[in-house]
């Protein structure tokens, strides 16, 4: 068997920075003198989350958190997805030291939403339940709606201000597929005369998808490695399926399907929240047969 890796795969810079930040803090906190928390799951990867838990890192339930809780002398890390400004204020009031590991690209989208909500309506494209979009929406201060696909963009009720020739801006979830975003923008342009579209898709997403498409020409089957709850991994897997090559989505080496061993050349790619050691383990197990 031959195993070929996509030219671009695994951790993106934003996720790597967030993980490295927490790992460094955990190593400095070996005597557990103060609590170390992440506000919500740091990344959508079960293996990494288990490793962090074993190092004493705890996860705060974002939905049930209140500023009344006492986190004095603790450290709370904001994950790469970011959080709304109101939540950040609550964290600071809890007495904890707050470390912001929000991805720089998400911060840029937050700034766009804040700036343009003063004069226009903000429309976000992507998963309405995703932490990133929830964080960005918080900066639009109520002048915002989220559309998840082109069909929704064509039918969703728009505020009266837009019906009266008002202006709007469109901001994408950083992990959305370019084709999905273009379709949403096209549908909205037919309904909003003054719509400014910002390209806020992270190159890490499109780079992984492009590398996967290129890899598909060189292999017999594809394995996509990543958390099944990860938005970018699910989109990467859909790209693999679209190549028409046999494709599987796995979280780690234990999930490698038996069927894969009937193929001679296997292509490997991984989502932006998949650590290097998991990719290495999958490749090793494939080569061992």
Swiss-Prot record:
One of the record's GO molecular function terms: 4-hydroxy-3-methylbut-2-enyl diphosphate reductase activity
Record InterPro entries: LytB/IspH
UniProt binding sites for isopentenyl diphosphate: 44, 81, 130, 230, 232, 273
Sites where the protein binds (2E)-4-hydroxy-3-methylbut-2-enyl diphosphate: 44, 81, 130, 174, 230, 232, 273
Binding site for dimethylallyl diphosphate: 44, 81, 130, 230, 232, 273
Catalytic activity: isopentenyl diphosphate + 2 oxidized [2Fe-2S]-[ferredoxin] + H2O = (2E)-4-hydroxy-3-methylbut-2-enyl diphosphate + 2 reduced [2Fe-2S]-[ferredoxin] + 2 H(+); dimethylallyl diphosphate + 2 oxidized [2Fe-2S]-[ferredoxin] + H2O = (2E)-4-hydroxy-3-methylbut-2-enyl diphosphate + 2 reduced [2Fe-2S]-[ferredoxin] + 2 H(+)
Active site: 132 (proton donor)
Cofactor requirement: [4Fe-4S] cluster
Residues noted as binding [4Fe-4S] cluster in the record, renumbered to the chain: 12, 103, 202
PANTHER family assigned: 4-HYDROXY-3-METHYLBUT-2-ENYL DIPHOSPHATE REDUCTASE
Role noted for this protein: Catalyzes the conversion of 1-hydroxy-2-methyl-2-(E)-butenyl 4-diphosphate (HMBPP) into a mixture of isopentenyl diphosphate (IPP) and dimethylallyl diphosphate (DMAPP). Acts in the terminal step of the DOXP/MEP pathway for isoprenoid precursor biosynthesis.
UniProt protein name: 4-hydroxy-3-methylbut-2-enyl diphosphate reductase
Lineage: Bacteria, Pseudomonadati, Spirochaetota, Spirochaetia, Spirochaetales
């Amino acid at each position: 068997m031959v195993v070929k890796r996509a030219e671009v795969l695994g951790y993106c810079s934003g996720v790597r920075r967030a993980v490295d930040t927490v790992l460094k803090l955990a190593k400095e906190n070996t005597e557990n003198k103060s609590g170390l928390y992440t506000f919500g799951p740091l990344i959508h990867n079960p293996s990494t989350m288990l490793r962090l838990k074993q190092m004493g890192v705890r996860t705060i339930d974002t939905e049930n958190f209140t500023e009344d809780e006492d986190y004095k002398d603790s450290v709370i890390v904001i994950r790469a997805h970011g959080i709304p400004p109101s939540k950040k204020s609550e964290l600071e009031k809890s007495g904890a030291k707050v470390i912001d590991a929000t991805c720089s690209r998400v911060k840029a989208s937050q700034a766009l939403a804040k700036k343009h909500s003063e004069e226009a309506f903000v429309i976000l494209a992507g998963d309405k339940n995703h932490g990133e979009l929830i964080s960005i929406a918080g900066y639009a201060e109520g002048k915002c709606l989220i559309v998840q696909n082109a069909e929704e963009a064509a039918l969703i009720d728009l505020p009266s201000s837009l019906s009266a020739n008002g202006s709007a801006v469109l901001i994408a979830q950083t992990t959305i597929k370019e084709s999905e975003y273009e379709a949403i923008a096209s549908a909205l342009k037919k309904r909003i005369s003054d719509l400014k579209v910002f390209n806020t898709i992270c190159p890490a997403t499109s780079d992984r998808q492009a590398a996967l498409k290129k890899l598909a020409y060189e292999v017999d089957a594809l394995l996509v490695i990543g958390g099944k709850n990860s938005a970018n991994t699910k989109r990467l897997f859909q790209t693999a399926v679209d190549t028409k090559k046999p494709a599987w989505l796995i979280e780690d080496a234990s999930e490698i399907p038996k069927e894969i061993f009937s193929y001679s050349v296997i292509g490997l790619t991984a989502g932006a929240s998949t650590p290097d050691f998991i990719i290495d383990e999958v490749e090793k197990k494939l080569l061992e047969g």
